[in-house]
Amino acid sequence: MTTAANTKENPVTTTQTVPVRLDFEAHAGGFYKALAHLDQAATKELDKVDFDVRLRELVRIRASQLNGCAFCIDMHTKDARAAGESEQRIYALSAWRETPFFSARDRAALALTESVTLMAGTHVPDADFEQAAAE
């Protein structure tokens, strides 16, 4: 489907936004602010260790995919594009294990992201921590 915002020259730009299902700030302002502070603190720590901003956004997109949060996927995809991430890697992210587009460091970060995000009822394997630390 082609619209004014989705053309051959600009295939990924859209004026549509993902609807917000719940206004967290209005209904749980303290919780929302705590999450925002946690995100800011995590970003500061990642900046201290020179963690690539593009990889940071890929990690956030992948966690959002696993959590099924359309709003977060949309937000972090826009942030990844703004940081210079390639469309190819963004599109391939859900199948990152099957593509050659990701480095060993990327793969370690994505594997750890999946383990931590999906750890309900299990634990994060030691091998994932070890691989992430090695890269």
How would you label these PLM feature ranges?
Residues 22-24, 52-69, 97-98:
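Alpha-helical scaffold segments that form or flank carboxylate-/histidine-based iron centers
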Residues 52, 86, 134-135:
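Helix N-cap / loop-to-helix initiation motif
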Residues 25-26, 30, 92-119:
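Short Fe-S-cluster ligation motifs
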Residues 1-57:
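Acidic, glycine/proline-rich low-complexity segments that act as flexible tails and inter-domain linkers
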Residues 33-37, 68-72, 120-126:
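Short acidic alpha-helix initiation/capping motifs at coil-to-helix transition points
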Residues 60-91:
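Conserved alpha-helical segments that form or flank metal/cofactor-binding pockets of metalloenzymes
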Residues 109-135:
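Short flanking/linker segments adjacent to small metal-binding domains or redox-active Cys/His motifs
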Residues 43-44, 60, 77, 94, ...:
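Amphipathic alpha-helical segments within well-ordered protein domains
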